[in-house]
Amino acid sequence: MTLNKPVHSENMRFPDQPPSYQHLRAVQRQQQSAEPFKAGAFIDCGWGRVLMGHTFEKPQDIAEQLLHEPWGKRDIAMYVADPHVVLAAAPQTLFLDPSDSYRLDLEQKLVEPSAGARVSVKRLASLDQARAVNELYLKWDMVPTDPEYIWSQCASDQIVWLVAIDAESEAVIGTVMGINHMTLFNDPTRGSILWCLAAYPQARHHAVGELLVRHLAVQFLA
């Protein structure tokens, strides 16, 4: 899921079109005072890298990065305008994930004042919480992440882990990770993205995942 602050531009692409390198350049040109965005941007998430496909000028450059995926990791390219061209560079090695992505309007009311009275959502604050996050990944057969790495990123302005905590037991019952496009590559469209949403399967509270999504949106809206 991508989280975007509204940007009013005469040359915005259609809503069902993925962003592209050319689109970023067009938006940047309209914002004459804007600093250039960082080309070829990616970030290490512990379980692998997320490549910001629309910061790569050529599809072949995306393929080249993906072909260097370390063993035991999962590198993913997001915002790829021409995935068929990327796949053509290594059709026996690369594959297209059929998952959809959605955009969330950050102008709407995101968190009710009374929401989550029995569950608090906070930024990850300890190594023990990082271990709990990795345990949630394992419960859902997600690629595991070294808790030490998660904890080492606790003060990062590019990547954030939020945890949902049961107010009574103080156990971590959910987690979500987000990437800030602005601090990562100076995104002229002021975007951000949600990754790795997971909730404890036997949690006694409902809508833990939704609460995490809403709090992450507020985090990036601030």
Each model region followed by its residue ranges:
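Short coil/turn motifs at secondary-structure junctions
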Residues: 107, 181-183, 202
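Conserved acetyl-CoA binding element of GNAT-fold acetyltransferases
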Residues: 40-57, 188-201
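Conserved acetyl-CoA-binding loop-helix of GNAT-fold acetyltransferases
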Residues: 58-67, 195-199, 205-221
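Short Lys/Arg-enriched alpha/beta "domain-start" segment
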Residues: 2-45, 61
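Acyl-donor-binding surface of acyltransferase catalytic domains
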Residues: 25-29, 47-118
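Short amphipathic alpha-helix that is part of the acyltransferase structural core
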Residues: 5-6, 109-147
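Nucleotide-sugar-dependent glycosyltransferase donor-binding/catalytic pocket residues
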Residues: 126, 204-205
